[in-house]
Amino acid sequence: MDPNTVSSFQDILMRMSKMQLGSSSEDLNGMITQFESLKLYRDSLGEAVMRMGDLHSLQNRNGKWREQLGQKFEEIRWLIEEVRHKLKVTENSFEQITFMQALHLLLEVEQEIRTFSFQLI
């Protein structure tokens, strides 16, 4: 697990929690929750890859792990679209920087999850 990615997640979550986007605060809270869920999922996949031979354990724990993987990729795509939309509508430079970093992080995490999942297959 890349320590820079972990600190990036923490930084972005902290920045997002400080934002006041008016009526869209529920949307932002939803994004924060999904970011946290995505981080936990990515971390658990990374740990499974680190423990060689853990594929069988992962499959035994959850026979639908491939389905979960597909759902996570859908969540990532949704988050990417939401972040892009927020980037288009916000005029505050602090928020723009935060959403740009969030977009970069999402793309990075998507690639990491793909790499982890290919190693598990």
From Swiss-Prot:
GO terms for biological process: exit of virus from host cell nucleus through nuclear pore. Pfam families: Flu_NS2 (PF00601). The keyword Transport applies. One of its GO terms (cellular component) is virion component. The keyword Transport applies. Signal peptide: none annotated. Keywords: Host nucleus, Host-virus interaction, Transport, Virion. It is found in: Virion; Host nucleus. InterPro entries: Flu_NS2. It comes from the Viruses. A motif (Nuclear export signal) lies at residues 12-21, 85-94. Mediates the nuclear export of encapsidated genomic RNAs (ribonucleoproteins, RNPs). Acts as an adapter between viral RNPs complexes and the nuclear export machinery of the cell. Possesses no intrinsic RNA-binding activity, but includes a C-terminal M1-binding domain. This domain is believed to allow recognition of RNPs bound to the protein M1. Average number present in a viral particle is estimated to be 130-200 molecules. Belongs to the influenza viruses NEP family. Interacts with protein M1. May interact with host nucleoporin RAB/HRB and exportin XPO1/CRM1. This is Nuclear export protein. It comes from Influenza A virus (strain A/Henry/1936 H1N1). The lineage of its organism: Viruses, Riboviria, Orthornavirae, Negarnaviricota, Polyploviricotina.
